[in-house]
Amino acid sequence: MAKQAKGMKSITNLAFEKTYGQMPSDGTWYQQPINKNALTGKQSLIQSNTITGRRDMTEPGIGQMDASGQLELPLDVRNIGNILKGLFGAPTTTAGTKEGTYKHVFKVTDEIPSLTIEKGFPDIGLFFTYTGTKFNKFSLTAQVGNNETTYTVDTMASNETEAKKTAATAPTALKLTRFNNVNASVKEGGTALATCRKMQLDINNNLDGDTYCLNGSSIRPSINEGMSEITGNIETLFEDDAQLQKAMNSTETSLELEFTRDNFSLTFSVPEVILERATPGISGPKGITQTLNFRGYYADDTGNSIITVTLINDVATY
């Protein structure tokens, strides 16, 4: 009986491309820890309506290649840096305040890099590579409860190819050190929001993947960046109307989600935010919570970005 591929033996590797859609011939490959990898290539079959005088349908047509899918990853101290680089572009890196640490600051840029991502099944000797991959949407939820802290990245790629051996012969594996929900804290308007139970943050690059051309292939020749969009929500204990009043009056505020572990930290700062009005309901006898959606924007903040992500760890460069 043939061997079945096992998820626990699978690998996900990534490398940044120098030219869009071309697997790098040099540079560093990274082995990325994942919880799930749904990146896949799909090519639809088009039903034929051709009439030939028989009841039998004729050969179907072949559609465009759609290489895309979602990655679910553990929130960690080091590997998150490569994901943030794919989401924003290369960071500005300086020495950290603690010995042996580095401060990486990510902001919105006009263009984001492309990657080659490899999804491998080494136990059966099959490897699928996705060239021209860009990160479209990042979603992270910090919340109370005994939940593993993970995040998702929606990807869009140019093409999928199959190989019998890995393209990443000696990938770099950064040590996995987790950030946990118990390491999280939230600030609103620059002040600790001690009653916060949950914060969801969505970063959307609004990529345009409808770039197919009549060029003799079925793949995307490019993927264009759209407007950077920041949305999400906060859930708090309903103890007063401090946040609700800001929502009712469309008062500008700010939000910050920070994870801290030892000398390392990860901070998402959205400096200009409007909370969406929604008064809390009553669903039973227990304590009342309120959930307010938010939307970030850029007007005049000195940080010159709709969002700033600061990662402090012991990795020298990304």
Report each predicted region and the residues it spans.
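Signature of extracytoplasmic/envelope-associated structural regions
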Residues: 1-318
